């Protein structure tokens, strides 16, 4: 009986470890500077993390907005102006400039801290590798190659 419980526990632990973000496998800490995280960023892993975002956002070209704007091409867009149909807050529109890797990283860390007055209710992604993966995924969807030095 103990052997069965032990092997079940080991199998469960191995399964959970396979699902967890593997910072060790990438050789970069989630707290490493953004350029180091972007060197190991994985757009495929970013697609999986983006599922959280898909509750409010779409990503395919030409797809309409939801509670949040469509994000196709956002990495080439001016902050607060990616979708002509979405009603961005004045706070977000006042940021100015374009989305950069650094800006996206700050936004994805804590949107309300980066832009007080934003309507985005998402609390942010704590894991820096998850943020880098999402940034890579956004660049892969209408944004070209990230320049995140």
Regions found by a protein language model. Name each.
Residues 46, 50-59, 134-138:
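The canonical Cys-X-X-Cys-His
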Residues 16-18:
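C-terminal motif of bacterial Sec signal peptides marking the signal peptidase cleavage site
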Residues 21-49:
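Electrostatic cytochrome c docking/interface patches
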Residues 47, 61-98, 122-124:
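Gly/Gly-Pro-rich "capping" loops immediately C-terminal to redox-active cysteine motifs
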Residues 98-149:
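C-terminal capping alpha-helices of c-type cytochrome domains
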Residues 1-9:
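Bacterial N-terminal signal peptides that target proteins for export
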Residues 20, 54-57, 147-149:
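Sequence contexts marking disulfide-bonded cysteines in secreted/extracellular proteins
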Residues 25, 59-62:
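Secreted/processed peptides and extracellular or luminal domains of membrane proteins
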